[in-house]
Amino acid sequence: GDKVMPRTAEWESRWWSPIINAEHLQMRETAGIVDLTAFAYFDITGPSALAVVQKAALRQMDVAIGRVVYTPVLGPNGGFKSDLTIMRLGESHFRVVTGGAHGMADKKWFADLLPEDGSATIKDITSDYTTLGVWGPNARKIVQEVTSADMSNEAFKFSTCKEIDIKGVKVLASRISYVGDLGWEFYVPMADGPALWDALWESGKNHGMIPVGIGVYGTTGRLEKCYRAYGPELETEYTVVEAGMQTPKLKDADFVGKEAHVKHRSEKPAAMLCTLFVDDHTSSTGEKRYMMGNEPILTLDKQPITDSHGRRSYVTSAGSAPSLG
């Protein structure tokens, strides 16, 4: 309706569609199902599996079986190499879930940390698995109707995962969200993907669920919640502190980039990632124009803003925020 504003300028309309905003609003009001087949997955197993993921991850990985940890992965300089999710599936079994575009780079980073004695191995299962995500206020109702597992908040807490059965399909369910709404990611063997989709879709039709594309998942949904993305917000040149992702307490275990990160924590950051809300898109010509990312941020007298390292301020990601008006 009125919340779906048109874009008349050709440049910023290239990868934009009013359908994105419409899907977003429906997801926020009811629920949306997202095809996340493009994810990359690899399992790290063996007696030294914990040591490998501890070495790679900024966050604590010595957690209970069934915990899901979202973590930055740093380079030696303390800048970002990646951000990804790691699930602890067993005492010596961890599953890494990351974006498909960066999956091979992440796999090599972890593989390079494997011990030479073979006490930990890495297996790429990207071609074997697919993922569906269901999010929105009605997500719990939709899933609960097709499984005997208890999907209540008390029984299935945020940042946990467990195996459940959905209409005869064995599913690894992870309660995590990149769009800022209640919901789960469901991982199944590729051959079971259609059956899982059908089961969720049939249940979702009774609760207003619609298919939602990556424009919502990767842009409007995440930006409304100020979630960061590797590449636009998280990059090697900027630190965890500058990105606002430092933890209150640093784990004792060593990890790549720890020395640099400890130094960054003790210093005043030269730059800070923040969210800007543009309430007037009218340009000097009178036409409404919209940012797409990488635009410079200037002072009121049109001068560049430069930090103590000589880096100029710029827009990392930009997109609509339909639920915020």
Describe each model-derived feature in a short phrase.
Residues 33, 41, 72, 85, ...:
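Conserved hydrophobic/aromatic beta-strand scaffold that supports enzyme active sites
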Residues 47-80, 139-169:
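Internal amphipathic helical hairpin motif
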Residues 1-71, 79:
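Acidic, proline/glycine-enriched N-terminal capping motif
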Residues 1-15, 89-325:
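Conserved, structured C-terminal
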Residues 45, 74-76, 298-302:
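A generic structural motif
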Residues 24-27, 39, 56, 70-73, ...:
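Long, contiguous hydrophobic alpha-helical segments, chiefly transmembrane helices and signal peptides
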Residues 55, 59-113:
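Well-ordered mid-protein domain cores that form the structural environment of catalytic cofactors
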Residues 35, 83, 185:
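Acidic active-site catalytic centers that drive phospho-/nucleotidyl reactions
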